């Protein structure tokens, strides 16, 4: 269903914080972006052998960096992708229960790529039966401007790997209008979001004036890009629009729509899910304190104004960080 067709069906209210419950014991690693020594102890969230590390990052605008805005991020490191998937499902299900009860709706933003495989445990017991899927409203942080049944479509990827396996109402899944141009699809998606804010389905950030999604489940490319915001591309500096478009993506297909950083950074929760040695360089840079505002990777520009940011990683992804 396109966004314009889906908005009419929607209506509800607001957001608060997750009281995190302690999970079964797991290993813990304490570190910061300044490279403090590692230590061990209990882990508050992961259900499997994992490590935890608060880290620092720089805000997305040079002005914020100049103001010395360094926000804490939590880093969870898992021995295996299976363990990561179990913990990510638990994290998302707990947020769903908490925020759906408080707001009457749960707004979830997905990315493409391996993220859909990583959330597969949500479509299995116990979550398949225990999650209130009727409260879910699903969006995409970016989308390729291709038909919905095209192999490059993030919608198709999510439909095949996740959405077809859980009972989320069709009218609460907000795909782009694939009959429009990239510019038209971006404008249409932003119009949809504004209507859903007006209806109370999506909260509005009081501090930023941008929509405040309950949780964004995001991935990162080996070059440090998130959404369709690529290193060195002018779109990383867009600070007015909610949704914009790109026609010269360095990664095919070239035409896409994407949320902007003000929207990403207004989220209540972000889970950055990154696995594999191929992304270790970008992870090391993102969690280092040596960056300057002139050489930030897009992933470093994801700094929540008033929310909680958690990295879900495996050991290969943080191998350069641990060896530092």
Swiss-Prot record:
A Pfam cross-reference name: Glucosamine_iso
CDD domains: 6PGL
The family this protein is said to belong to: Belongs to the glucosamine/galactosamine-6-phosphate isomerase family. 6-phosphogluconolactonase subfamily.
Biased composition (Low complexity): 24-34
Its EC number(s): 3.1.1.31
The keyword Transit peptide appears for this protein: yes
Biological pathway: Carbohydrate degradation; pentose phosphate pathway; D-ribulose 5-phosphate from D-glucose 6-phosphate (oxidative stage): step 2/3
Enzyme class: hydrolase
Name of the protein: Probable 6-phosphogluconolactonase 4, chloroplastic
Keyword DNA repair appears in the UniProt entry: no
Region Disordered, annotated ranges: 20-43
Top-level taxon in the UniProt lineage: Eukaryota
Function: Hydrolysis of 6-phosphogluconolactone to 6-phosphogluconate.
Substrates-to-products reaction catalysed: 6-phospho-D-glucono-1,5-lactone + H2O = 6-phospho-D-gluconate + H(+)
One BP annotation, GO: pentose-phosphate shunt
